[in-house]
Amino acid sequence: MLKWAIIFAIISFISGVFGFRSTSAGTASIAKFLFFLFALITLVLLVLGLLGIGVVA
């Protein structure tokens, strides 16, 4: 679970960098949406991983 949280954190960071520096309003709004979506997924997976709740492999 923590592996997925780290992956989504990296995706969130990358989409934030490209979205917040973009000049086009359309791509900036999409990247900002993706940034907050992946940030939310990161937080959920991080909490689930720390609590020990997850899929048993």
Curated annotation (Swiss-Prot):
From what superkingdom does this record's organism come?
Answer: Bacteria
User: Where are the membrane-spanning stretches?
Assistant: 1-21, 33-53
Give compartment(s). Answer: Cell membrane
> According to its record, what are the GO cellular component terms?
plasma membrane
Identify its membrane topology class: Multi-pass membrane protein
**Which protein, by its recorded name, is this?**
UPF0391 membrane protein NE0130
Keyword vocabulary terms for this entry: Cell membrane, Membrane, Transmembrane, Transmembrane helix
Family stated for the protein in its record: Belongs to the UPF0391 family.
Any Pfam family: DUF1328
Q: Which InterPro entries match?
A: DUF1328
